């Protein structure tokens, strides 16, 4: 599911990875970065949610910190990295429990790391699968889908306008019963929970943006229809895979496959230049 945004923004990258089967080599020497931090914090929250501990218990914060210690030990981070990341997590721990406690009464079931089975996308005959960071089942056949974020990307606006459709597509899969852990449900809210460096935990619904609101169901179906249209386009053997169709930043040309697409060479020339 994570590659759907790539297919929109940089189709050539999907072509190189999935059709040419080219995979970028890992750097020989590289310190853990933002992606690894996000993975680690996700693992802590997943393990804590799966434990079934009531966040209203007096020892909930200590239990979360203990879970964090376990996950940090397993990650075996370089000392200088842990010296920055661990205090950041400690600042978050109390706020996470406060956020959990504020919403626990309305939750029937917490399903962390819920897996969506392969689901056919309309007439395209292609399938979509993936994971949701967390699904909170509510009464009356409803559920909230939560996506933890340790950074600022994607923005609420990018998700609402479907430039970054992953969370919304999870809503479409939920409606289609793709998540076996919870069964077919209607999405009530689609939200990022941002774990900020200053210790703030921000629950950010993507259902409203620029004074325009849509229901989770309507937004999910719109994303599903757009995905079907996109996949049908690429079923045409004559359809090309454009490089950097909708790049995040025009000036950045350090994508894994940008050198294969000769991005620098194609962007070096300007209007009016000739081969003379």
Predicted segments with their positions:
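RecB-family 4Fe-4S metal-dependent nuclease core
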Residues: 1-276
């Amino acid at each position: 599911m994570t590659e759907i945004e790539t297919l929109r923004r940089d189709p050539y990258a999907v072509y190189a990875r999935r059709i040419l089967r080219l995979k970028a080599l890992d750097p020989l020497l590289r310190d853990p970065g933002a992606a690894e931090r996000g993975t680690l914090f996700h693992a802590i929250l997943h393990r804590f949610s799966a434990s079934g501990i009531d966040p209203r218990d007096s020892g909930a914060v200590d239990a979360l910190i203990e879970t964090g210690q376990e996950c940090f030990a397993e990650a075996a981070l370089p000392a200088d990295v842990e010296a920055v990341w661990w205090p950041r997590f400690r600042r978050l721990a109390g706020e996470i429990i406060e956020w959990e406690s504020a919403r626990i009464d309305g939750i029937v079931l917490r399903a962390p790391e819920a897996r969506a089975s392969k689901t056919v996308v309309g007439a395209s005959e292609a399938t979509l699968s993936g994971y949701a960071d967390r699904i909170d089942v509510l009464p009356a056949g409803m559920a909230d889908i939560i996506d933890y974020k340790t950074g600022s990307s994607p923005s609420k606006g990018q998700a609402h306008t479907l430039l970054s459709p992953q969370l919304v597509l999870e809503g479409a899969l939920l409606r289609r019963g793709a998540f076996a852990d919870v069964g077919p449900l209607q999405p009530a809210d689609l939200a990022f929970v941002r774990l900020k460096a200053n210790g703030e935990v921000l629950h950010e619904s993507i259902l409203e943006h620029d004074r325009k609101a849509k229901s989770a169901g309507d937004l999910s179906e719109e994303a599903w229809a757009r995905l079907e249209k996109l996949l049908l386009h690429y079923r045409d053997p004559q359809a090309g895979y454009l490089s950097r169709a909708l790049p995040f930043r025009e000036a950045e040309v350090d994508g894994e496959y940008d050198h294969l697409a000769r991005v620098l060479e194609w962007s070096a020339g300007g209007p009016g230049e000739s081969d003379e």
